[in-house]
Amino acid sequence: EMVEISIMENQVLFKTETMYFYSRLLEGNYPDTNRLIPTSHNTQIEFYVPELLSAIERASLLSHEGRNNIVRLSISPDSVVLYGNSPEIGKVEEALNYENVSGEALDISFNPDYMKDALRAFGDMNITVKFLSPIRPFTLEPTETELDFIQLITPVRTN
C-alpha cells in the first residue's frame, strides 16, 4: 500500500487510501536519555522473558490492589525472589528461574507495569538485566549480542 508523507515545520501527515495519520512536534527538548543509561553495572542476571513476564504479571495482581503498585526484586548469589504486597489482600513471594547471576546482592523496587511493557517488546528470548544500585535506572538487553536493543527502567524508592 502506498503511503504519502507530507512534512511541515512542526507536523507530519501520513496518508493512505483508507487512513490519515497526523502528528505534531511537541515543543521543548527531549530529555538526554544517554545520561540515564548506565555505562557500568554491579549486578547482572539473565532471564527467559516469558517466564519473567508471567511472574511479574502474577505479582502485579496484588500490587495493583494496593496504593503503591510496586514490586520488589531481591537478587542474591543463590536465589532471585520477586515480592508483591497489598495490605488489604496479602503478599506474594515467588522464586524466579534465572540463567546466570553475577555481582553484588541487590534489592530493587519498580513499577510492574513499566517492566511488563518492556518485557513484551522482547518477545520469546533471553535477556540480560544489569543493575548499578537500588536507586539508579537499570537496563534490559537481549542476551544475543547481534541485537542492538535496550530498555531502561527507573526504580522506585521504598522504605
Show which residues each predicted segment covers.
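Short hinge/gating elements
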Residues: L36-S40
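DNA polymerase processivity clamps
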Residues: E1-L26, H41-N159
